[in-house]
């Protein structure tokens, strides 16, 4: 019992240090901190660094899906930047039943009409119950999707992406998902594979302790007659 108490005290101290370091050393492009995935956040367009109408951009965020049964059967929005016509530029949505990701982008049509084309890019089977880094990078008509620093999908858009620099970004609206989000970042330029890998290696805390918590988790189990009745992870 004494050893267990020492371990728990050390964990509390490490967690406290991680929170303090994460608070003071977050990069300027980092627009969100650790937040409940079931709660709605709004990122004002005015807070985006070098925010322009350029169709070349990069979004990066970290998320942890804890319980996939939460809102099972309903699409779960990770983030959305909707223009005045409620069209995505872009939106990122988790699947209703499968652990898939759908990225939607409104594009200009090739004809002279003002009608938009909504293009979707899908990524299947993203990891659950661990921290995941998702990066979407758009250059011209090419949309690259990175998970944990690796390029997993490239989609070719039917037209140039629409961007409304005045549109705010909403994170996990309508109940979101069971878990957490953190370290949302934005750049007004595309990202190459090396940059994407560097973003991932920087960790969701941007510190040594952040990388430590990204790599390791602790499971606490509740036993009754040596049988596990419940557990939780930190």
Regions found by a protein language model. Give the residues of each.
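Extracellular glycan-associated modules
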Residues: 1-234
């Amino acid at each position: 019992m004494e050893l267990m108490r020492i371990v728990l005290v050390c964990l509390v101290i490490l967690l406290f240090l991680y929170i303090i370091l994460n608070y003071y050393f977050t990069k300027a492009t980092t627009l969100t901190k650790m937040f409940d995935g079931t709660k709605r956040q709004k990122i004002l367009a005015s807070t985006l660094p070098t925010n322009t109408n350029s169709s070349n951009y990069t979004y990066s965020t970290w998320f942890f899906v804890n319980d996939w049964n939460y809102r099972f059967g309903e699409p779960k929005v990770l983030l959305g930047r909707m223009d005045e016509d409620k069209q995505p530029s872009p939106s990122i949505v988790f699947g209703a039943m499968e652990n898939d990701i759908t990225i939607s982008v409104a594009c200009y049509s090739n004809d002279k009409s003002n009608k938009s084309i909504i293009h979707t890019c899908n990524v299947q089977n993203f990891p659950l119950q661990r921290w995941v880094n998702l990066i979407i990078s758009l250059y011209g008509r090419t949309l690259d999707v990175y998970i944990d620093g690796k390029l997993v999908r490239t989609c070719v858009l039917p037209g140039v992406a629409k961007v409304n620099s005045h549109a705010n970004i909403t994170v996990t609206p309508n109940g979101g998902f069971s878990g957490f989000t953190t370290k949302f970042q934005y750049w007004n330029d595309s990202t190459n594979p090396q940059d994407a890998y560097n973003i991932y290696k920087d960790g969701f805390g941007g510190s040594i302790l952040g990388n430590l918590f990204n790599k390791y988790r602790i499971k606490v189990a509740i036993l009754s007659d040596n049988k596990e009745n419940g557990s939780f992870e930190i």
